[in-house]
Amino acid sequence: MRAVICGAGVIGASIAYFLTRRGVKPIIVERTGIACAASGKSGGILARHWCDGTPSQQLARHSFDLHAQLAGDSREDWGYRRVTTYGGSGSARTQTRHTSQNPIGWVSAQIDVGQQLGSTEDTAQVHPALFTTAMMRAAQSQGAELRIGTVTGVKQAAGRVSGVEVDGALIEADAVIIAMGPWSILAAAWLPLPAVYGLKGHSLVFETGAAIPPEALFLEFHEAGGAVQSPEFFPRPDGTIYVCAISSDNPLPIHPAAVAPDPGAIERLERICAAVSPALASADIVARQACFRPIARDGLPLIGRVPGVTGAYIATGHSVWGILNAPATGEAMAELILDRATRRVDLAPFDPRRLKPLNPAQLRFGAG
């Protein structure tokens, strides 16, 4: 089996990992670097039950369990730990001090943390970039090969894939897996695939200089100008705190390296953080960043065979749950490619055939 994976984010790395566990030595083609986009700039929260009642329930539950198994089996440290998660509210326009004791000690008295959303039984976290890199490194140790280059086409012969064009050269393949996050939309010019969109989000990483308890916080926060944001705060075991908020629908640039924060978005997020926590108001900021999360038209991932082209597969569109669902996606894709069926997760809800293929003439990108 000659397999080529297009994309070295968390989904591509996870597919490579599980393929190598079955004896396949895939080639992973990446034009920028491992975890260069959302896989390296997301929060890394894991929740076992938060997709319950949706078509992603089985995928999320199994993937949560796989995360624990992978962390237990590996000698590498990618920041996996169980966390307690809370929900609350706050406003930049009020100085009201809540008389009840907040369960989180590092937030301002003006923040009302009134709900526990998850416990160490069902919520956890990883450092996304470290996890993705570790999965890729494990795959490489079993024979996978990472090549830096730009995929420019998928070659076909007699209704099946025959290879991938990379910077003008052909890599022969029996299986081609598109796992390029929101840039998977580029593959609609080569294969009959539905559209994948990018939802932009902004984030900060603070260096607090002290260990913060494993407590994740989800807020509804009213800015001084009246806008309502939903910032998320994830302390990490390395002494940093990751915070994200402020989404936008700005167009996806054609190259991942061209992604940059929207004007004013980082400053707004810094003001929110200063209002929420004195620890953040005085902490150094070690990363100011933005990324695009991949989303399909109906909000569900695209995982499965590309219709009408034998040997072509896609795995993308996981939205905010890409880190959570990567292990189960990687395992299921390896089963689908090698066994033609999956054992633990039913991929029917994510079949690309449920959505109409995109007309390549409609492809549009932002600057870069």
Residue ranges and their predicted role:
Residues 17-18, 44-46, 78-82, 180-308:
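Active-site substrate-recognition segment that forms the wall
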Residues 277-368:
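C-terminal catalytic lobe of FAD-dependent flavoproteins
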Residues 30, 148-150, 287:
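Short loop/edge segments at beta-strand edges and connector loops
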Residues 11, 34, 183:
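Conserved Rossmann-like nucleotide-cofactor binding loop
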Residues 18-21, 31-85, 93-101, 224:
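Conserved FAD-binding subdomain of flavin-dependent enzymes
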Residues 69-149, 153-160, 295:
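Flavin (FAD/FMN) cofactor-binding and adjacent substrate-gating region
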Residues 2-27:
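N-terminal Rossmann-like FAD-binding beta1-loop-alpha1 element of flavoenzymes
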Residues 127-213:
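Predominantly flavin-linked oxidoreductase catalytic cores and closely associated redox partners
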